[in-house]
Every structure is written in structure tokens, then in C-alpha cells.
Regions:
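Intrinsically disordered, low-complexity boundary segments flanking structured domains
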Residues: 26-27, 69, 172-176
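Residues at beta-strand starts and edge strands
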Residues: 20-24, 34-36, 78, 97, ...
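Structured domain cores in non-transmembrane regions
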Residues: 36-151
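A structural detector for beta-sheet-dominated domains
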Residues: 27-31, 41, 72-76, 83-87, ...
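Short, surface-exposed loop and linker segments with low hydrophobicity and enrichment for Pro/Ser/Thr
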Residues: 15-17, 21, 29-31, 87-97
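A eukaryote-biased signal for long
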Residues: 122-244
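Beta-strand-rich domain onsets/edges
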Residues: 4-25, 32-33, 40, 229-232, ...
Length: 244
């Protein structure tokens, strides 16, 4: 079956989760001055994409499609709760593959005046048999993740100060989630934001004619400095053991 025919059928009978479905609950509480982003990605083993190897051989891979989910957050408590359908329906028979939940700052002036929000942190959940990183924790039916996260400052010589959020894995922490039919499925994400500790990535300008133009270092809350790097070690923020 050609790619164009599959695309035609997908457009004529598009992604449309059936009402008679199973659902994954995503809930939690986000800190003040942050906003959530919830993404869901579906996979189809019926609709395939065609590829060619360098030697001319043809092979096929599953198609993917995803979208953002509008989230309603309680403005007082920060609580949110959304449901993600297991099946996406449509001619392609979409089913859930990954769920990504990220929080980002909306305002950082309480930390540094005139700084701007930067990157966020959160979780990436790989459902059932989806391709996943080798090194990650795996759960069945339920994930309850309550990390401590921190603000971090990125100070570049040629851009305004930027403040992002940093978690255990930097951006998103990955988990595998196996779903047993007939069980309740839930993902709970309740981070604690500790704004008393803020590591800094500082990129200063080298003299003209010296490459690279920027010279980076990382400064930690306890005064430690890592030279010639622009990435943060999470365990150093709170001055704990790397293996805790």
C-alpha cells in the first residue's frame, strides 16, 4: 500500500479517539510562576512510512503523530488533572506511544530583574513497547514522581539573562510504563521547586581572534566552579553524593 494512499485514508478518517476507550490519568501540582506543557504522541503499525537504504533496499517504519493537550490548572493550588486516551482511532488505528509533561517559568523577575524564562524540566513516559532509552526506571500502571527541581541561570555575554528549570536529568527524566488492561493507569508529577539554590552557567566573551568566542563555566550554590563546560551536574546543586 503506497504512502500516498495511506495519507489519503488518514486524512479522510483522521485521528479521533473513540469514546469507548481506556484512559491514562496525568495529574499533579505545579509550582507558582510556572506553566505546564503536555504532549501526547501516537504510533500506527497499520500506516507505515517507506524508506530506502543506501543500497536501494526498501524498508518500512511505523508512522507517528502527536499534539499538545490543553491543561486546566487551578490558579490557587496549582493542581491539574487530564486524561490521555489509549487509542487514537482513525483509519490508521493510532495508539499511545509516549507522553511528555514539562513545566517552564512564566516569570522570573522575583529571582533576577529583567531576566527572561528559559528551558523547562519534566518527564517523558514511554508506554508499553515503545522504543525507549536503555537506562531508565520502569513501572507498571502507575508512576508517582516527586522530584526536587531548581532554577538555573544562563548568563551569556551576547544575550539577556535567562532562567530555566533543572531536574534530575536536566530536561526531562525518562520512565517506562507498562499498562495492564483493566487496571487504573496514572502518572503523578509533583515537583518541589527549591529557589534557594540556583546554579549558574556563565559564558564570557573571549578576546577578538580567539575561538571559540565564548568561554563557559558552571558556578554552584556552594561556591564550586566547573571550568570549560556549560552543563550542570544535578547532584552538585545540593552538594550531595553523585550516587544518592
Amino acid at each position: 500500500m503506497s504512502d500516498s494512499w495511506q495519507t489519503y485514508k488518514d486524512n479522510s478518517e483522521p485521528f479521533s479517539p473513540p469514546e469507548n476507550n481506556q484512559w491514562i490519568t496525568v495529574e499533579g501540582v505545579i509550582p507558582p510562576n510556572t506553566t505546564p506543557i503536555l504532549k501526547r504522541r501516537y504510533i500506527s503499525n497499520k500506516c507505515l512510512s517507506t524508506h530506502n537504504t543506501a543500497g536501494g533496499a526498501i524498508y518500512h517504519t511505523p508512522r507517528h503523530q502527536g499534539d499538545d493537550v490543553n491543561i486546566s490548572v487551578n490558579p490557587t493550588t496549582g493542581y491539574f488533572k487530564e486524561k490521555i486516551p489509549l487509542q487514537g482511532g482513525g483509519w490508521c488505528q493510532w495508539h499511545i506511544n509516549t507522553i511528555v509533561f514539562v513545566i517552564m517559568y512564566t516569570d522570573v523577575n522575583h529571582l533576577i530583574k529583567d531576566a527572561v524564562p528559559y528551558t523547562g524540566t519534566g518527564i517523558t513516559i514511554y508506554i508499553n513497547d515503545s522504543e525507549k532509552p536503555k537506562e531508565m526506571k520502569k513501572f507498571t500502571n502507575y508512576i508517582n514522581y516527586k522530584p526536587i527541581i531548581y532554577p538555573f541561570l544562563r548568563k551569556d555575554y551576547d544575550t539577556p539573562n535567562q532562567i530555566g528549570l533543572y531536574g534530575e536529568s536536566g530536561g526531562t527524566t525518562s520512565f517506562g510504563l507498562s499498562l495492564i488492561p483493566g487496571s487504573e493507569w496514572k502518572i503523578t508529577y509533583m515537583p518541589t521547586l527549591d529557589e534557594t539554590k540556583m546554579p549558574k552557567i556563565i559564558v564570557s566573551e573571549n578576546p577578538p581572534g580567539i575561538y571559540p568566542r565564548g568561554n563557559a563555566r558552571v558556578e554552584y550554590p556552594d561556591g564550586k566552579i566547573d571550568l570549560n563546560r556549560d552543563s550542570i551536574d544535578y547532584w552538585k546543586i545540593n552538594n550531595t553524593s553523585q550516587w544518592e
